[in-house]
Amino acid sequence: MEKYIILILSYVIGSIPFSLIIAKINGINLREVGSGNIGATNVARTGNKRLAVLALFLDSLKGFVAVYTAQQFCDNNDLYIYVSAILAVLGHMFPIWLRFNGGKGVATTLGVLIALNISIALAFVFVWLIVFFIFRYSSLASLAATAAAVIASFFFQKELFLILLTVAILIFLKHYKNIANLLQGRERKFL
């Protein structure tokens, strides 16, 4: 029974819209700024770097907390840990509090990766930074980092492959407009 509670908790934790809350406290409506997304990247588009870093930290932290909590109650490699990881990301993407209209799940995925395998998390961050600084597209960096995490799972922890592939599919689906804009040369660079 407690494992089912952990799964529900993972979704609920993932559903906390920290970026939206932080922005609102500071008089910013993220739905009306930049891309309209409620994630940390859109907080960065407001020009407030301090808020952006805080949003990134808190959105990542909720992914970490959800998985870490599951790890405390489950055996290593227990399916419940992996399902809690997916549910935390789904919570961010489809939060119950916002009529299931949330962010894209990238920062929350980083937190999940830190809890599951730090080597994969580092590969994720490394690829994100490299792609971002070369191309200046947050969306492209996020997609590349997500793909890199799936590939890295082959080298560092094969049992994470299907979980990370599932998360990657979700992230790619949430980025479908960005992908179309990238292909058409209309995606906005992050300056």
From Swiss-Prot:
Subunit architecture: Probably interacts with PlsX.
Underlying gene: plsY
Pathway entry: Lipid metabolism; phospholipid metabolism
Source organism of this protein record: Wolbachia pipientis subsp. Culex pipiens (strain wPip)
Membrane topology: Multi-pass membrane protein
Enzyme type, top EC level: transferase
Biological process terms in GO annotation: phospholipid biosynthetic process
TM ranges: 5-25, 51-71, 78-98, 114-134, 153-173
Catalytic activity: an acyl phosphate + sn-glycerol 3-phosphate = a 1-acyl-sn-glycero-3-phosphate + phosphate
Listed name of the protein: Glycerol-3-phosphate acyltransferase
Keywords, in A-Z order: Cell membrane, Lipid biosynthesis, Lipid metabolism, Membrane, Phospholipid biosynthesis, Phospholipid metabolism, Transferase, Transmembrane, Transmembrane helix
Annotated GO MF terms: acyl-phosphate glycerol-3-phosphate acyltransferase activity
Keyword Signal attached: no
